Amino acid sequence: IAALVIDNGSGMCKAGFAGDDAPRAVFPSIVGRPRHQGVMVGMGQKDSYVGDEAQSKRGILTLKYPIEHGIVTNWDDMEKIWHHTFYNELRVAPEEHPVLLTEAPLNPKANREKMTQIMFETFNSPAMYVAIQAVLSLYASGRTTGIVLDSGDGVTHTVPIYEGYALPHAILRLDLAGRDLTDYLMKILTERGYSFTTTAEREIVRDIKEKLCYVALDFEQEMSNAASSSALEKSYELPDGQVITIGNERFRCPEALFQPSFLGMESAGIHETTYNSIMKCDVDIRKDLYANTVLSGGSTMYPGISDRMQKEISALAPSTMKIKIVAPPERKYSVWIGGSILASLSTFQQMWISKQEYDESGPGIVHRKCF
């Protein structure tokens, strides 16, 4: 029987079957509840909507994301998302398939146990496993050693991995990711006189960001280019037909990844965080990390980001060091793909936590079997 692989991100949930090369279902990790009282009889109004349906009815709903900064904060809503994944997206009976879930690095232990408990007690899974997201991305790139810069919608991590083991003392977390960049773009578009405020309008700005933003190789240079010519300007049509023009916002938005001070944050940018993470590792393995710096997650999809990372890290590292930034084209889904690879390995089959083991040991079993 095929195992299920579910990668629950802060922004998008990716789900599918182990052994496939891409997720079957990709939908927003959103639960929406009606803002207004239903007046039409027989409309069959629901008290909650999940994913794309919530997205399409966003005009009348309040949208909530149960996963914040990579970590589940609302378990009732999370259960709704899983329910939706099994029954509506994949159309499978969860009690018939082992399920591989992913978790953020440095996920609190209690969260891991809660995930395990819900899978076995609510969904009656026959077996499950919890894997760290960044480790799966590295598997997907065909490596067992390297440092993964995983930046999604809710959180960014740098995770050094040696021979398949994450090095927890050197993992760094940066609470700056796609959602913050969307908020920042909303803010700088407001300076242009365009107003975006509601949760529904935020989704429009997210689309603008995904379609038009890019990372400048040299920010100051790009700013002066933008000031002196209109070559960088692009137009975007809003759902109501209004057309807006966006110029230096295109690269000012993702620049915040390298200069978090743009968002009023006192933290190191992604290049410096990656370097700091490498420096926390044993001196003997640093060379391997510099040469295998793997980008993963949706917020690494900006054009120009790998060249910029190469430039910034070269400036920080010893001058003779060989630095290689690996940016696989499918990196938006590399966590899921890594999970699909892992769950279909024959050697992995003894790693599953079975329902029987869970019944004997309780949720704590997850710390012994998943590392």
From Swiss-Prot:
Primary location class: cytoplasm
InterPro entries with a match to the protein in the record: Actin, Actin/actin-like_CS, Actin_CS, ATPase_NBD
Similarity comment: Belongs to the actin family.
Lineage: Eukaryota, Metazoa, Spiralia, Lophotrochozoa, Platyhelminthes
Its EC number(s): 3.6.4.-
GO MF, one annotated term: ATP binding
Stated role: Actins are highly conserved proteins that are involved in various types of cell motility and are ubiquitously expressed in all eukaryotic cells.
Keywords (A to Z) from UniProt: ATP-binding, Cytoplasm, Cytoskeleton, Hydrolase, Nucleotide-binding
Disulfide bonds: none
Name of the protein: Actin-5
Enzyme class, broadest EC rank: hydrolase
Cell location: Cytoplasm, Cytoskeleton
Organism, scientific name: Dibothriocephalus dendriticus
GO cellular component terms, semicolon-separated: cytoplasm; cytoskeleton
Catalytic activity: ATP + H2O = ADP + phosphate + H(+)
